[in-house]
Amino acid sequence: MNNKVNIAVLVSGGGTNLQALINAQKSGIITSGEIKLVVSSNKNAYALKRAENAGIKTAVCERKGISQKEFEESILNALEKEKIEVIVLAGFMSILSADFVKRYPERIINVHPSLIPSFCGEGFYGLRVHKAALDYGVKVTGATVHFVNEIPDGGRIIMQKAVEIKENDTPEILQKRVMENAEWIILPAAAEKVCKEIKERKNERI
């Protein structure tokens, strides 16, 4: 019986975290869920090509020229069509409203490039996070996968992985190390953990 949990990945750019998820699905790290849909807020995102190469359905929902409500409705329509149960934010650059998040309680996960509660919340994204860590002088940083709620980076933590900061690090070098040594490892592992728990709950009801 194939009762895998349907996953959608929301993207805006190059899709390196999406690729990590696709690779994890191929290699058997993600077995309880299946990526059924990739939704991009940018029609030119290379992530769409990655999805296409992996034979995954795609949808483009651009924010430009429409209200937040219309933008979110277009995403919800795409998700509902594929009966999506878990949403993974992988470099998705749009903020989702509290109303949207409430529709998927503890079903939306995000990866943040620091050890929350450090260097997180409003204004902390991309290279800014790594610059802040270097400016502060911390010796260890990392990545966190957490559930998404209405507070930026405020949802319950699912997994964390630490990464050492080296003496001559720049924000760019540190970003690459955190991606390779933390984000690409814990995002697929956390997606599997969440899907496995949902699958077990579904099986209990059968």
Question: Could you tell me what each predicted segment is?
Answer:
Residues 1-206:
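One-carbon transfer enzymes
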